[in-house]
Amino acid sequence: QTIKDRWLAEAFFFRAYHYFDLVKKYGDVPLILKAFDTTSDPDIKRGRDPRETVIQQCYEDLDFALQHLPEIDDIPEGDWGRVSQSAALGMIVRIGLYEGTHKKYHQTPGGDYKAHLQKAIDAAEEMIYIRKDHELYQNGFEKLFLHDGEGRQNKENIFVKVYGPLGTINHNNSRELESTVSMTRNMLDNFLYTDGLPREKSQVRPLTDISIDDIFINRDPRLAMTIYHVNEKAYKGPYKPFETNSQNHPFGYAIKKGFILEEDQSNSGSNDKMIIRYAEILISYAEALYERDGSISNPK
């Protein structure tokens, strides 16, 4: 029974993961908790269930997963990437914060927004103060998303999709980043300045930020690790935003976060994809506390 419960726990985790994704996209969705034996089953055409009902089922699935999944440090090396108790807690944090703030600001029917925020807070506190299985990566923001940040040795990893050497499963991340992916100016403006303030309030932003190089001045250093400077080494030579080879970036801000120069050919990418990381837990914890209380007074 223990073995069966372990695999049921994995299935329940992914059911919660995907139902949460459906709720984010569609709101109310049909909640199907059985396999269909025949196409004549009336539930095939079942109507939508309230989003609160679906989210509560997600919590139940994740609670079961939390009881029966292994701790992340007990997962064998060959099974790295399988879901763990940490992943279940991380999903509770993600769902609780999202649903809590959604109900608070959109006033969707059913449930209490503070109850969802409390779910996120409780799960985050269990990870941060009780289990202490995770910590932030210390070897640089840029390396976090490259091969350096892979595996169990990086304690920031909570749940990742593992990609392998050629011949197994690979991706086109670096190739696509250098093809059509671009950051909008609106997203760029969310990067704070060194005084901790956004563009419209900062006292240290340059008088002009028309050129691409201007946008990096007195900015959160993570911006320079996320998009290219002009003439910075990139795919097929230095990045020149207004030349023909670089015009696939519709907004002129080319993404370099996660780009690996040696993996620019089709299906050659093998660095793992982070799905849940510890930084998300920390910032979600702070946000959930603020949304619940209107302030953050936790001395921890």
Predicted regions, residues:
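Aromatic-anchored glycine-rich loop motif in surface-exposed flexible loops
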Residues: 1-83, 94-112, 254-276, 283-300
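An aromatic- and glycine-enriched ligand-binding surface/loop that stacks and positions planar moieties
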Residues: 33, 63-66, 82-243
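Active-site lining segments that contact anionic ligands and/or coordinate catalytic metals
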Residues: 154-156, 220, 271, 278, ...
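Conserved oxyanion/phosphate-binding beta-strand-loop segments in alpha/beta enzyme cores
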Residues: 242-250
